[in-house]
């Protein structure tokens, strides 16, 4: 029984904590977290968030803004703005974008790796 408890403890320690790992950001915090920063994504794409509202990801150029407590972006040829909840990892290295549909994208600051 002790071996089972030890194994369960080791499994739990290797799992990230659910709510404690991420801190939801407010509008001003989103602006501060993204302005003039570059995030890298698992597929190798880099996204640059320019101070003037331009964002560049790979060969694509779009626009970004903060509306309330949401990050919003538009990527031509679409003219539809899509907004996301934003959270920062507890260690401050990663930014998580969560869409209305529950989709999640996580990027890491390239200057903090």
Please report, for each region that a protein language model flagged, where it lies by residue:
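Lipid interaction determinants
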Residues: 2, 16-113
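Sec-dependent signal peptide recognition
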Residues: 1-9
């Amino acid at each position: 029984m002790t071996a089972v408890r030890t194994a369960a403890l080791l499994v739990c320690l290797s799992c990230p904590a659910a709510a404690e790992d991420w801190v939801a950001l407010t509008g001003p915090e989103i602006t501060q977290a993204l302005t003039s920063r570059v995030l890298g994504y698992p597929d190798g794409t880099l996204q640059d968030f320019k101070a003037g509202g331009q964002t560049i990801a790979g060969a694509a150029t779009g626009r970004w803004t903060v509306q309330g407590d949401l990050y919003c972006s538009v990527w031509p040829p679409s003219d539809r703005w899509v907004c996301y909840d934003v959270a920062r990892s507890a260690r401050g290295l990663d930014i998580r974008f969560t869409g209305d549909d529950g989709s999640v994208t996580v990027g890491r600051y390239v200057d903090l790796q």
